[in-house]
C-alpha cells in the first residue's frame, strides 16, 4: 500500500512580529519593557486590583451573618424575618468571596488593562514624568506620574494605578530582577 504524503505548512522561524517598539522617541527614558500580553498576563494583572482584603472581608461578613442567624433562630424560632435577611447577606458575602477573581478579571477587561484589538505584545516605557503603554498596532497611552495613585508589587509583577481605570502592568519577567526592583522603588517614590 502506498503512503499518502500530506503537505505541511511551513512554520514561521520566528515568533516575534515585525513591529519594533522605538524607545528613541521618548525623552528622559528611565525604564523600558516589552512582553507578551495574553489571558495569563491579564489574569495576573487583575489579581492586583482590590487585593485579597475585600475577598477575606466578605467571607468574614458571610460567616458572621450565618452565626448571627443561628443565634437569632435559637433565641426565637418564630422570628423568621431577621433570619432570612441574615441568610441573604451571608449568601451574598459567600458569592462575592467565591467569585472575587472573576470580578477582578471583569473589571480589568473594562479598564486600560483590557485587550484592544488582537495585539499580543505590549511595551511599557517609564520616563521622568510619565508612563507610556503601547501595543503592536501603534496605539499608545500616556499616564502622568503626577496622577499615580497606587503601586502594587510582588515577585510576579507590578501594577501602577493612575485613577479612572487607567493602569500600567509590568511583569517581572520582562526585565532583570535588579531593574525590576529599581522600577518599583522609583514608582513608589513617585507616588509619595
Residue ranges and their predicted role:
Residues 2-68, 72-73:
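N-terminal membrane-targeting/pre-transmembrane regions
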Residues 4, 156-192:
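A membrane-cytosol interface segment of integral membrane proteins
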Residues 31, 122, 141-143, 166-168:
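Short beta-strand segments
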Residues 53-66, 90-102, 119:
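N-terminal non-globular leader segments, chiefly Sec-dependent signal peptides
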Residues 57, 61, 70-91:
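Hydrophobic alpha-helical transmembrane segments
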Residues 95-142:
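Conserved beta-hairpin
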Residues 126-128, 153-155, 162:
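Generic beta-strand structural signal
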Residues 131, 141-156:
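Phosphoinositide-dependent membrane-docking surfaces
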